[in-house]
């Protein structure tokens, strides 16, 4: 009857939770999961206090008492609806800048990696919509000529047309974090192992496509 509290985005939920619950139904049907999104600056405090068992996020500057391993890595692509006027094999920087963009971020303000890369080139994209949720973006994309920069795995899952980015940005890394006080806890270690194995399977499946 153990309940695990995990901080993650809706993007990570969509990748991790379906295969996790397939596994839990077989191995531990009474285990419960509570998913939420903690503020990044509070991750260490929440893990240390036991209010979170795990956090799944990009690389963070955390306390030395917080352990972590990399779960997933995915490259970013420019995604749009199928049939979009710019749905082709390659985009120039000028074509990318001509698009009306959705920017996904849980923060109220701040630039994304694409914007930082464009800024170094003296360029700026047009962000028409800033949203917290990836899932919402797919609905807007399918009904408009807007574009969104998302991980390749997400674009495939939602049948979006994807084009390589015309600017170089680092891939998205997702790490799993836990507090050292739970490092040897049998339940915590078992759940950690399940999520690491699931991430390995997701990675292998993507590489096989």
Predicted features along the sequence, with ranges:
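Short, surface-exposed acidic/glycine-rich loop or hinge patches that mediate macromolecular interfaces
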Residues: 11, 38, 108, 181-182
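Beta-alpha-beta core module
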Residues: 63-70, 74, 132-183
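Short, well-ordered beta-strand segments
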Residues: 3-7, 55, 79, 102, ...
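A late-sequence structural motif
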Residues: 15-16, 88, 163-205
């Amino acid at each position: 009857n153990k309940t695990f509290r995990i901080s993650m985005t809706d993007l990570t939920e969509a990748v991790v939770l379906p295969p996790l619950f397939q596994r839990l139904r077989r191995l531990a049907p009474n285990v419960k999961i509570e998913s939420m999104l903690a503020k990044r600056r509070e991750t260490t405090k929440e893990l240390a206090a036991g209010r979170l068992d795990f956090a799944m996020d990009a690389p963070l500057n955390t306390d030395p008492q917080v352990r972590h391993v990399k779960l997933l890595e995915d490259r970013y692509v420019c995604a749009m609806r199928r049939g979009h006027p710019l749905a082709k094999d390659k985009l120039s920087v000028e074509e990318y800048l001509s698009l009306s963009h959705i920017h996904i971020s849980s923060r109220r303000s701040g630039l994304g990696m694409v914007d930082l890369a464009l800024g170094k080139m003296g360029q700026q994209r047009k962000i028409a919509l800033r949203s917290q949720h990836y899932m919402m973006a797919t609905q807007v994309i399918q009904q408009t000529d807007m574009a969104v920069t998302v991980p390749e795995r997400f674009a495939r899952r939602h049948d979006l047309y994807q084009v390589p980015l015309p600017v170089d940005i680092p891939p998205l890394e997702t790490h799993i974090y836990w507090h050292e006080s739970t490092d040897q806890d049998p339940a915590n270690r078992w759940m950690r192992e399940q999520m690491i194995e699931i991430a390995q399977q997701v990675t292998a499946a993507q590489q096989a496509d």
